[in-house]
Amino acid sequence: MNDNPANAEPQEEEVSLESQPSTPESGSDGSKEAELEAKIKELEDSYLRVHADFENTKKRLEREKFQALEYAYEKIAKDLLPIVDTLEIALKSANEVSGEESELQAKFKEGLELTLDNFSKVLQRHGIEMIACEGEFDPHLHECIMQVPSPSHQEGEIVQVFQKGYRYKERVLRPAMVSIAKSN
């Protein structure tokens, strides 16, 4: 539209400037590309860490769920142990009665024995077992409430059991209360 040659030259210069990429801009494109690649790498690394954390948490929760199910009887078993103790004490008292036993006393004692026997079988059926209290003292299974001199026992050996201990699978529900021999 403009036939003026003075106006035509600057337009050509502008076109020539636009068509030739400048060196600083191409360097910034390269640095932008490097920045973007670094950001992508950082985000990929972050994603992998979050994913690994998620997988670890998932595995931990599965393990805890399995343990909770596996040890579900533990709480009720702890609550039942005093009942077993009471039955054992009652049976011991019934056995210590001196004099002639009446038929009623004999039936009562027999009932206590059967109840205690059934209770013990139920506990065993559900994986609850009594802790053995013979021989050497084990601090993981026994609780020493006193040390006594005993010429018939070696030092550290269990002399007397005051309260039976129980365990459920690998966990100790209640340690056995014992006395152990001490050196003379």
Curated annotation (Swiss-Prot):
Q: Which GO terms of the cellular component aspect does the record hold?
A: cytosol
Name its cellular compartments: Cytoplasm
Q: Which UniProt keywords apply?
A: Chaperone, Cytoplasm, Stress response
Please name one Pfam family that this protein belongs to: GrpE
Composition-biased stretches (Polar residues) = 17-29
Task: Write out the ranges of the annotated region (Disordered).
Answer: 1-35
Instruction: Kindly list the GO molecular function terms attached to this UniProt entry.
Output: adenyl-nucleotide exchange factor activity; protein homodimerization activity; protein-folding chaperone binding; unfolded protein binding
Main localisation, per the record? cytoplasm
InterPro entries in alphabetical order: GrpE, GrpE_coiled_coil, GrpE_head
Please indicate if the UniProt record lists Cytoplasm as a keyword: yes
**Superkingdom of source:** Bacteria
Q: What does the entry give for GO biological process?
A: protein folding
Function text: Participates actively in the response to hyperosmotic and heat shock by preventing the aggregation of stress-denatured proteins, in association with DnaK and GrpE. It is the nucleotide exchange factor for DnaK and may function as a thermosensor. Unfolded proteins bind initially to DnaJ; upon interaction with the DnaJ-bound protein, DnaK hydrolyzes its bound ATP, resulting in the formation of a stable complex. GrpE releases ADP from DnaK; ATP binding to DnaK triggers the release of the substrate protein, thus completing the reaction cycle.
Which PANTHER family does its entry note? GRPE PROTEIN, GRPE PROTEIN HOMOLOG, MITOCHONDRIAL
Q: How does it assemble?
A: Homodimer.
Instruction: Give the protein family.
Output: Belongs to the GrpE family.
Name of the molecule in the record: Protein GrpE
Q: Specify the species.
A: Wolinella succinogenes (strain ATCC 29543 / DSM 1740 / CCUG 13145 / JCM 31913 / LMG 7466 / NCTC 11488 / FDC 602W) (Vibrio succinogenes)
